[in-house]
Amino acid sequence: MEIILIKPVRKLGKIGDILKVADGFGRNYLLPQKLAIRATEPNKELIVKQKHEFEAKDKQIREEVEKINALIKDQQLVFIRQTSNDGKLFGSVTNKEIANKLSENISYNISHSNVILDKQIKSTGIYTVEIRLHAELNAIVTVIVARSESEAQDYLREQKTETSEDLAESA
């Protein structure tokens, strides 16, 4: 299936790109999410005329996302959870919980689909989580999972000493 991107898509292309994609990917993801349109002759002519408008709109969205990224950057989210004796959580910390806590902290609604977890968080510790609000921009948030507030503070102190040691080694 041949499509024209009307929004930038990570690892695929930018606005106005004409691409061949698998039929299922186009029909089931790109078209319903309004990320692309079919590459028919009338649509190709239309996209040439409207490409500037799409790019201006994307630039405006990107500027807004950059402001939000500045708020998100270097956030530390602390989750207090019950655990077994070996530090395993009863359950897990989900992307929805991270999005909700982050939304509370910055007073801006973050969708759980913007929170990218490499793997589920099922034990205590410090994790880095990617927040992707735009195809080309992302921010990193530190998530601390602990049994108590004092344990969370210990993790923070431990992290600060590690970063100061790293800075001393690089100097």
Swiss-Prot record:
GO molecular function: rRNA binding; structural constituent of ribosome
Signal peptide residues on this chain, from the entry's feature table: none
Gene Ontology CC terms, in alphabetical order: ribonucleoprotein complex; ribosome
Pfam families: Ribosomal_L9_C, Ribosomal_L9_N
Alphabetical keyword list: Ribonucleoprotein, Ribosomal protein, RNA-binding, rRNA-binding
PROSITE patterns named among the record's database cross-references: RIBOSOMAL_L9
Gene Ontology process terms (BP): translation
Family under the similarity heading: Belongs to the bacterial ribosomal protein bL9 family.
Function: Binds to the 23S rRNA.
Name under which the protein is recorded: Large ribosomal subunit protein bL9
Organism (species): Rickettsia rickettsii (strain Sheila Smith)
Classification of source organism: Bacteria, Pseudomonadati, Pseudomonadota, Alphaproteobacteria, Rickettsiales
